[in-house]
From Swiss-Prot:
Similarity remark: Belongs to the class-II aminoacyl-tRNA synthetase family. Type 1 subfamily.
Keywords: Aminoacyl-tRNA synthetase, ATP-binding, Cytoplasm, Ligase, Nucleotide-binding, Protein biosynthesis
Subunit-level organization: Homodimer.
One annotated GO molecular function: ATP binding
GO cellular component terms given for this protein: cytoplasm
Organism: Chlamydia trachomatis serovar D (strain ATCC VR-885 / DSM 19411 / UW-3/Cx)
EC number: 6.1.1.23
Enzymatic reactions: tRNA(Asx) + L-aspartate + ATP = L-aspartyl-tRNA(Asx) + AMP + diphosphate
Name this protein carries in UniProt: Aspartate--tRNA(Asp/Asn) ligase
Amino acids binding L-aspartate: 177, 223, 447, 488
GO biological process: aspartyl-tRNA aminoacylation
PANTHER family, alphabetized: ASPARTATE--TRNA LIGASE, MITOCHONDRIAL (PTHR22594:SF5), ASPARTYL/LYSYL-TRNA SYNTHETASE (PTHR22594)
Lineage: Bacteria, Pseudomonadati, Chlamydiota, Chlamydiia, Chlamydiales
Length: 582
């Protein structure tokens, strides 16, 4: 049986007089007495079909029994709609199909939520439980089809650039990469476990050792970590690695790749992208993921804070803290109530409070007005280039606290005051990250232990490791990190040195990374790589609020699959086969 001659988005006035066959779901049903109208929907669009009782009473009776989301196959004649009855919201809105025969292919139960009315707000848990119904509402399928086109564009471009797609193993060895591993018990080796990959990091580096010049993979990765709006326990990344190159070779390739991906949605990007060091980003925006669609740039105010008699300023400076903030153009219209709300907001991030200074009619209004002279305030206005009716918002706190609080505050204010265009795409490369971070007073990798230090900082590894910068880079878009990578260590002695600084014993290194150190010891080319978060890119590209909206079958924020009721208990016999007990 041939189910269709056309899709539900294809018919137009050019087809009037043709006999056609369509298949799809009942999107909407309307019985106007002697006339039944059905909007028939498939993946591609909607076509109105119609049956008149006076012309075909038996068929009219059958169509009158049809309900929402039944699957139909219909035959009929394409006719022009009556003048004034056209639907400009449909590509098929100038025609309708007068049905001559109808077959019910599948019936549907009563729906848990409306599919035809996309504007009805449906609880997300209910949507995820019935994900297959949620897909029919339109947005999800549109995003999945866009994702498909993005992956096609990715593969085509990287092939043009000489990259080879290689699939790396899913079952691997548990190695410390930052997050917790998902572990898979081995039946054949009782008491031993595979780990699902947090990334193909070691495999792709070993591919470079093996002589592959350029590698890529659209890889599924797994991390057992606490979830946020832009995180999932399993996610997809565009993984890349290349030999005999540095950042200056990689950046143009990635910029053109991103441009090709955005071109799928008709968005034109300009390259090269802006570059900024990690320290510049922290100093000016309080974060290594700055949103550059708007200003509100941070400025250090310590030299002016010392001229105050305000104890909170002076105490923070005495204990090595900072005073910094930003200027909000036209922000002098903020009420006391609004400023109190902002004060409570920054306290969530550890700040003690918020200092505000308004420039109004050439004078000063401030909650710290009595702690400094008029001249000091005027100096601050000049430093911030503040104009009349602007406001300065300042925080006195340890550097990390001040940065975090101000980062969140500037984003909040920019959103509330509509200081940016939501259709604007501002990319920036963040470079020269610290090689190490501090965790409970100990060294830990800022990215991962395979990142190469900058050549000029290698001499500091023993004397001042926290001052060592790395040859690493993130690509940030509108405040989201969408890619991260680095130059890799290709010298086994330097790699062992990094492991030693991280206080990994030789036994531990041999157990977890012995195979990798062995590989580096057989002649390894200089190499570097990057991974682009496909889910995050799709989230930004399609305007989705979370990455759950761009994944076919996502997990909840508690890492559960509501549709399949996973994770689930397993049978005692399965545990026994694995040599496990609960």
């Amino acid at each position: 049986m041939k189910y269709r001659t056309h899709k539900c988005n294809e018919l137009s006035l050019d087809h009037v007089g043709e006999h056609v066959r369509l298949s799809g779901w009942v999107h909407r049903y309307r019985n106007h007495g002697g006339v039944v109208f059905i909007d028939l929907r498939d993946c591609f669009g909607i076509t109105q079909i119609v049956c008149r009782q006076e012309e075909n009473p038996e068929l009219h009776q059958l169509m009158d029994q049809v309900r929402s989301e039944w699957v139909l196959c219909v035959e009929g004649l394409v006719c022009a709609r009556l003048e004034g009855m056209e639907n400009p919201n449909l590509v098929t809105g100038s025609i309708e199909v007068e049905v001559s025969s109808l077959e019910v292919l599948s019936r549907a139960q009563n729906l848990p939520f409306s599919i035809s009315d996309e504007h009805i707000n449906v609880n997300e848990e209910l949507r995820l439980t019935y994900r297959y119904l949620d897909m029919r509402r339109g947005d999800i399928l549109d995003r999945l089809m866009c994702r498909h086109k993005v992956m096609l564009a990715c593969r085509q471009y990287l092939d043009e650039q000489g990259f080879t797609e290689v699939v790396t193993p899913i079952l691997g060895k548990s190695t410390p990469e930052g997050a917790r591993d998902y572990l898979v018990p081995s039946r054949i080796y009782p008491g031993n476990f595979y780990a699902l990959p947090q990334s193909p990091q070691l495999f792709k580096q070993i591919l470079m050792v093996g002589g592959l010049d350029r590698y890529f993979q659209i890889a599924t990765c797994f991390r057992d970590e606490d979830l946020r709006a832009d995180r999932q326990p399993e996610f997809t990344q565009i993984d890349m690695e290349m030999s005999f190159g540095g950042p200056e070779d990689l950046f143009p390739v990635v910029e053109e790749l991103v441009a090709r991906l955005f071109a799928v949605k008709g968005i034109e990007l300009k390259a090269p992208f802006l570059r900024m060091t990690y320290q510049e980003a922290k100093d000016s925006y309080g974060t290594d993921k700055p949103d550059l669609r708007f200003g509100l740039r941070l400025k250090n105010c310590c030299e002016y804070a010392r001229k105050f008699t305000f104890s909170i300023f002076l105490d923070q400076l005495a204990y090595g803290g900072t005073v910094k903030g930003f200027c909000v153009p036209g922000g002098a219209d903020m009420s006391r109530k609004q400023l109190d709300i902002y004060t409570d907001f920054v306290k969530r991030y550890g700040a003690m409070g918020l200092v505000w200074i308004k420039k109004q009619d050439g004078g000063v209004s401030s909650n710290v007005a009595k702690f400094a002279s008029e001249d000091v305030f005027q100096e601050m206005f000049e430093a911030f280039e503040a104009k009349d009716q602007d406001i300065l918002l300042l925080i006195a706190a340890p550097e990390a606290v001040a940065n975090q609080a101000l980062d969140h505050l500037r984003r909040l204010i920019a959103r509330e005051r509509q200081l940016y265009d939501s259709t604007q795409y501002n990319f920036v490369w963040i470079t020269d990250f610290p090689l190490f971070a501090k965790e409970e007073g100990e060294l830990c990798p800022e990215h991962h232990p395979f990142t190469a230090p900058l050549d000029e900082d290698i001499s500091l590894l023993d004397s001042d490791p926290f001052a060592v910068r790395s040859s690493s880079y993130d690509l940030v878009l509108n405040g989201y990190e969408i890619a991260s990578g680095s130059q890799r260590i290709h010298n086994p002695d330097l790699q062992n040195k990094i492991f030693a600084l991280l206080k990994l014993s030789q036994e531990s290194v041999k157990e977890k990374f012995g195979f990798f150190i062995d590989a580096l010891s057989f002649g390894t080319p200089p190499h570097l790589g990057i991974a682009l978060g496909l889910d995050r890119i799709m989230m930004v590209l399609t305007g989705a609020e979370t990455i759950r909206e761009v994944i076919a079958f996502p997990k909840t924020q508690k890492a559960g699959d509501l549709m399949m009721s996973a994770p689930s208990e397993i049978l005692p016999i399965q545990l026994k086969e694995l040599g496990l007990k609960l």
